[in-house]
């Protein structure tokens, strides 16, 4: 009579295969999640840059974060973004700096914070760490 079921060796081989696949897949999956969060930060920076240009077309200088997200506040706006906080500094009639600062689960991301600086109509993009392959389009 033949028993039905798995032997201990078959079960151990299956667990070993699953373990090896997990070791390979989890880092790749984690990096893809980080990439999607970085893309969201860049989308938000692009949106804020469009708001800045819209604001500047009607005023003598670029706007503050609170002015751009009115009637809300910048603090309330940032509360809706789970992985980055947006700030605007260096506001002049000819330029400004937008920064997406990491927070929460993204706080240890290798790419650091994303910075978009506009000066005299020329935009420059950078990261706080200078890391390569950080998805800036």
Regions found by a protein language model. Name each.
Residues 1-29:
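N-terminal single-pass transmembrane signal-anchor helix
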Residues 4, 31-32, 38-39, 126:
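Short, contiguous strand/loop micro-motifs
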Residues 18-20, 44-45, 52, 73-76:
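Alpha-helical interaction segments
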Residues 23, 35, 108-110:
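Non-catalytic, surface-exposed connector residues within folded enzymatic/regulatory domains
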Residues 33-61:
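Membrane-proximal N-terminal amphipathic helix
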Residues 56-137:
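Periplasmic/extracellular, small/polar-rich flexible segments of pilin-like filament-forming proteins
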